[in-house]
Each structure stands twice: as structure tokens, then as C-alpha cells.
């Protein structure tokens, strides 16, 4: 984690010194489709769904830094045995900071790569029922996670760009449950 942050700071300092007049604050809205996956000793679960994201950041030229908020689809699991049922639900929200490098191809098309550090809020609810027993459990936890991203932007004007990208996020681990997200999104970035 410290190595990632040190690298991001070093990249941002060197990039700021080389930046051109294309600097400025921006906001970006993305509509995404995500696949949330969980792994634990009991097996694997996945859920696909809509994941909107809102970002605000600063464009230094070929380097951007952005803060974002992502809301993920609720992950549900149903298990039924001979004498019991277990219904689980995981809700997840994420706030993060991304460092993004844009490859300047001297054209409107700009591929990019980046890294992300996030704070993720998990809400986990279990409902266990058997013949003579009923138990519910609710857990709320906040975990840190890391991720990588890649995509391509297309400059419509000097201040407006279309964006299409992929993100992988390791969202954290709680009570033996690892949560990962694979996201594909499209959006619009407006620079001020």
C-alpha cells in the first residue's frame, strides 16, 4: 500500500511539472455494469448489475487524480437444505481516489491506465431458518481496497470527452469473505 501511494505521489509531482494548458477540474458520470464476486470457505457467489459512479477530479494534462463514489448492486444468495433455509444479502458502496495516466496519441482518442485506493462500506444481512430455530444477523463494516483501471477517452471538444473503461477492485475481506468487483462502464467527462 505504501509503495503504491509513493509511486502515485512521485508520478503526480513529475507530471505536474510537465503539464500543458489542458489542465483543469472535471466531473464525470459513468453508467456501469459490474460483477460482484465473493469467495469464502463455503464457496463462491456472484451477482451482476447496474453500478453508477460519480467522479470529480483534476486533469494535469496527461495525468489525472479523481475522487469517486460507486454504488453496487445488492449481492443476494439463497441456500436451502433439507431442514433449513439461509438468505444472505450484501450491500456495498465505495468511495475512492484514482490516479490515472492518459496516453497522448496527438488525436482525440486517449487510452488510459490507473490505480485506485478505496474505502468500502459493507452491509451484510443473514436470515437463517430451520424447523425449530430462526436467527438473523446484521454486520456493518468498513474496509479498504485497491484496484486497477484501464480504458479509452474520446475528446468530443476541448472540455468534453466520452469515456469507456474497465475496473477491477479488490473491495476487501470481512469475516473470511473476500469481495471483488469487475466493472465495465461508459460515461461523460466535463472539464472546467
Locations of regions flagged by a protein language model:
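Cleavable N-terminal export/targeting peptides
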Residues: 1-24
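Short loop/turn motifs that connect adjacent beta-strands in outer-membrane beta-barrel proteins
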Residues: 19-24, 104-110, 156-159
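Transmembrane beta-barrel strands of outer-membrane/channel proteins
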Residues: 29-33, 67-71, 113-119, 152, ...
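Outer-membrane beta-barrel translocator domains and adjoining extracellular loop/strand segments
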Residues: 37-47, 75-85, 123-134, 142, ...
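Outer-membrane beta-barrel "beta-signal"
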Residues: 26-28, 154, 180-192
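Gram-negative (and chloroplast) outer-membrane scaffold detector with strong preference
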Residues: 55-130, 184-192
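Short glycine/proline- and aromatic-enriched beta-strand/turn motifs that initiate or cap beta-hairpins
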Residues: 18-63, 189-191
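Residues that define the transmembrane beta-barrel architecture of outer-membrane proteins
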Residues: 23-25, 46-52, 59-61, 91-95, ...
Amino acid at each position: 500500500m505504501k509503495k503504491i501511494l509513493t509511486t502515485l505521489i512521485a508520478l503526480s509531482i513529475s507530471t505536474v511539472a510537465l503539464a500543458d494548458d489542458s489542465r483543469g477540474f472535471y466531473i464525470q458520470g459513468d453508467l456501469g455494469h459490474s460483477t460482484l464476486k465473493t469467495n469464502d470457505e463455503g464457496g463462491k457467489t456472484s451477482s451482476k448489475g447496474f453500478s453508477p459512479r460519480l467522479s470529480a477530479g483534476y486533469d494535469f494534462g496527461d495525468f489525472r487524480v479523481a475522487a469517486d463514489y460507486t454504488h453496487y448492486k445488492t449481492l443476494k444468495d439463497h441456500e436451502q437444505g433439507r431442514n433449513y433455509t439461509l438468505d444472505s444479502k450484501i450491500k456495498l458502496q465505495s468511495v475512492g481516489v484514482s490516479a490515472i495516466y492518459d496516453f497522448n496519441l496527438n488525436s482525440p482518442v486517449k487510452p488510459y491506465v490507473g490505480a485506485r485506493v478505496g474505502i468500502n462500506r459493507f452491509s451484510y444481512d443473514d436470515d437463517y431458518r430451520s424447523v425449530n430455530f430462526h436467527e438473523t444477523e446484521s454486520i456493518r463494516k468498513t474496509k479498504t481496497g485497491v484496484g486497477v483501471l484501464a480504458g479509452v477517452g474520446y475528446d468530443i471538444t476541448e472540455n468534453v470527452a466520452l469515456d469507456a473503461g474497465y475496473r477491477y477492485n479488490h473491495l476487501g475481506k470481512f469475516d473470511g469473505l473476500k469481495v471483488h468487483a469487475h466493472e465495465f462502464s461508459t460515461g461523460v467527462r466535463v472539464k472546467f
